Design a protein with these regions (language model features):
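Short, Lys/Arg-rich flexible segments
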Residues: 24-35, 40
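Helix-loop junctions and short alpha-helical segments
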Residues: 34, 40-144
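Polyanionic, low-complexity intrinsically disordered segments
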Residues: 2-27, 133-136, 144, 150-211
Length: 211
């Protein structure tokens, strides 16, 4: 069983691997190199999704660990002794999963959903507290993720509104032909590429949850 610090460190290691891979492929783009711009856009989408998938796993694994170990949580406050060492972790996972799991699942990509479950199962003094700016940035990242993962009209409309609004402010001409991968690779977010800023935001959030 991993500690919260181990869960955080494994996640940050994953982000560092993604950063390294992204840096390498960015150096192989254009004339005379291995990758075309459409190639780098698709690869950027894949790495971006990987970072978000690991983030979802971090949130899920952290809250399961907290529910299994924190005395103020509903599990430990109701049950003093367990038959086996790992029983609280198995019970915590079942309690936090969707009732119809695995056919349906909790949307761990939504931090608000994580906070809601923490409030319900862990009480008010839990670790799942981020600044308003951090939560807004995670919401932006989630919209990009949804545009890659879902391909639905709703996801695309949300993505289009995002890139036209602050802080990206893409013009109509810039939006023409844009894809999530092209946006991640080619556009800036507070002085860094969208990919770089997103990875930094996710790492900072992980360090806030587990100092």
């Amino acid at each position: 069983v991993r500690t919260p610090a181990e869960i955080r460190d494994e996640y940050i290691d994953s982000l560092n691997h993604i950063r390294s891979a992204y840096g390498k492929i960015c150096g192989q783009v254009g004339r005379g190199h291995l990758l075309s711009f459409p190639d780098i856009h698709k690869l950027s989408e894949g790495l971006f999704l990987s970072a978000l998938t690991y983030w979802e796993a971090l949130c899920r694994d952290l809250i399961v660990t907290d529910l299994a170990t924190v005395s103020a949580g509903v599990l430990r406050s109701e049950i003093r002794e367990f038959r086996t060492k790992n029983a609280p972790y198995r019970l915590a996972e079942r309690m936090l999963n969707h009732p119809d799991h695995p056919e349906k699942f909790v949307e761990w990509s939504s931090f608000e959903s994580v906070v809601s479950r923490a409030n319900e199962f862990l009480g008010q003094n839990h670790r799942y507290v981020l600044t308003q700016v951090e939560k807004q940035d995670l919401a932006k990242i989630k919209k990009v993720r949804n545009a890659i993962a879902h391909k639905s009209d709703k996801a695309w409309e949300s993505f289009s509104a995002l890139i036209r609004g602050d802080p990206f402010n893409l013009t109509g001409a810039q939006c023409r032909g844009v894809t999530p991968g092209r946006f991640i690779y080619a556009h800036q977010w507070n002085g860094a590429t969208v990919m770089e800023k997103s990875l930094t935001t996710l790492e900072n959030a992980a360090r806030t949850l587990v100092p």
